[in-house]
Amino acid sequence: DVNPHRIRKSIGAERTFNDDVSDPEIMKNKLSDLAEGVHRYMSKTENFGRTVTLKLKSPDFKILTRSRSFASEIRNLDELIRIVHDLLDQHLEEAPVVRLLGVTLSNLEKENEADGGIQLELEFP
């Protein structure tokens, strides 16, 4: 059964290229576009995440994913783009040519849940 009201665990976007890409600037431009789409959806739904994941698929279909987690939610588009670009720079040698790029934000918290919820008080006699 499909549950349309399930709690979302991540927000992501990916793009498969018609031709393999080896130019890091083209990769970064596409990652910026993907991050912008993720950020737009994240802002619209008020779901903010603490883990950013970069996905790279090589021409031989090997998939490389690299993540970075933070103590607080990523809310700023420029920060999200910087993190994704940093992940690419750190792992470009592992996948210098790609046919697919992806950006995912996980460890989501709704805006009104970001403060950790309500602290319950226990009464002691």
Regions found by a protein language model. Give the residues of each.
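DNA-contacting surface of Y-family translesion DNA polymerases
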Residues: 1-98, 108-113, 117-119, 124
